[in-house]
Amino acid sequence: MGWYLQAAFVALTVGVGNGLDTIIGNYVLRPRPSPTLVHVDVPLLYNSFPSGHACHMMVFYGSLLYLSFTRPVRTWKYHWVLLPFQVFAVLNILLMGYSRVFQGEHWLGDVLAGYLSGALWLTLFIFLYQWATKFVERRRSKRVGMQSMA
């Protein structure tokens, strides 16, 4: 199967995940940590719940991690690159959440909610990706079968 389905999977997952995060934040309206409570470098004016950074990292790197465990990628000639990438992706996801709390940009609950919403969105898109992959393979096998009969 061509790379277009994998590229569409990552692009749609990240793009729609960004929109979902914004919609949730506009409904919850939770304020960010204030300079009177914690040290904040630069107070931000927009809402804090859920952490968009944590959600985006979970969705983006999560989709790439998922693809890195699929058969076409595991049989890739440069498969030795996968383990360092997977470690990098997991560390990047975790350290982004830590940095958001450490800098006073988010409460811990905001970051955990960002991870959760990103994971739920990613899970839904993984199911859609698996369905689309099977659908494309069935159509391709029918088309090949019809061509061999002709």
Pin down the residues of each PLM region.
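Interfacial segments of alpha-helical transmembrane regions
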Residues: 1-19
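Short, hydrophobic secondary-structure boundary micro-motifs
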Residues: 7, 34-37
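Transmembrane alpha-helix/helix-exit interface in multi-pass inner-membrane proteins
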Residues: 15-32
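Short helix-capping/hinge motifs at transmembrane helix termini and TM-loop junctions
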Residues: 1, 28-29, 103-104
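A short alpha-helix capping/helix-coil boundary motif
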Residues: 1, 23-25, 81
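Membrane-embedded catalytic cores of phosphoryl/pyrophosphoryl-handling enzymes
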Residues: 37-150
